[in-house]
Amino acid sequence: MNSHFLTNDLILEVLSRLPLKSVARFHCVSKRWASMFGSPYFKELFLTRSSAKPRLLFAIVQNGVWRFFSSPRLEKSSSTLVATAEFHMKLSPNNLRIYHDNTPRYFSIGYASGLIYLYGDRYEATPLICNPNTGRYTILPKCYTYRKAFSFFGFDPIDKQYKALSMIYPSGPGHSKILTFGDGDMNWKKIKYRVLHDIYSQGICINGVLYYLGDTSDWDNDHDVTSGNVLVCFDLRSESFTFIGLECGQLINYKGKLAVIFWDDVDDDDVKDDAIDEMHVWVLEDVEKKEWSKYAYTWTEDKLYRSQVSVVGMTASGEIVFSMRKYTSEQPFYVYYFNPERNNLRRVEIQGFEAFTKFGTVYTFVDHVEDLNVYNLKHFKSVHPPSVQPEYDESDSESEEDREIII
């Protein structure tokens, strides 16, 4: 049937259900279709469809080379015990290697509204933003710092702007800076803050606020500033800081609110091999009033080992998601869904990594959506067409860390 006999609304309704890669191809069909796909109405419709079915995003790094996969996020009504991951891309433009490290001082990774931010662990490393679905990327301007700064990434949903935050060492020279991505010439600009603090965690962005863990106890701040471990809240729109006293834990998105996971017997910085079957969850209900809701959960099936899994978030239906930290083709890779209402734990095997990589460290994100607003961002370049055939880089030598087997 000729498309001229179909209404625009019907065409848009059908096409909004397609994957991002397919929509991108249809841009070339005609000027009419290109115009429709570029309209704010279709972009919002497509994002609404994608947000209704968020996916798990897996970023696997092996010797500085990153590969991205995604799989359906299985809700609690699903009885499926196996899910297949779709391979999206291998990120290695011009043989660039982005090395990772478990310490946020040396390596930063962030996810915000469809984009991944990486700042590698090496001298002269540069920050990079990429779209894990399409392979488009940009390398941000270098930001001079004493040694290497802590770095974070987030999205302001009101002004619809992505921002990268670079925080210097409190005792070092220079200035903390922020960069707005997507418009203009992408220059870093100075930001002011009065509270000196050490930084202890990666950041997480929720509804335009960046959160990370820090410590003010070693610095001479004003008397009204909490001394000790703190939750740092940075509003991306106003570019202002708030500090809340809080012990160290693990930060997750809890149905659109910031939550902190605590284990019953260990400090979060001290990852043990002991099996765990209990956790405490604090949900930040009000930032200004510093009010928390507190929950404690236990389970009996499939005891987990903190050295092998991490909490990565919560689904819209209220299940807390755990993911394995390491992948090896010699054994299955699992994601766990914990239902607080029933106190039960589901284990789902993720298949599909083995065709593209043998081993690696895995970073998992719970609420990955495809957003057309990030498809044609001004500064993005194209990586070589994403490989869709199974491939190994036999020249990559296995490091001692990557050789760890998870039981």
Curated annotation (Swiss-Prot):
Residues 391-407 have a biased composition (Acidic residues). Residues 1-45 form the F-box domain. GO terms for biological process: response to arsenic-containing substance. InterPro entries: F-box-assoc_dom_typ3, F-box-assoc_interact_dom, F-box-like_dom_sf, F-box_dom. SUPFAM superfamilies: F-box domain. It holds the Pfam family F-box. Residues 385-407 are annotated as: Disordered. It comes from the Eukaryota. This is Putative F-box protein At2g16220.
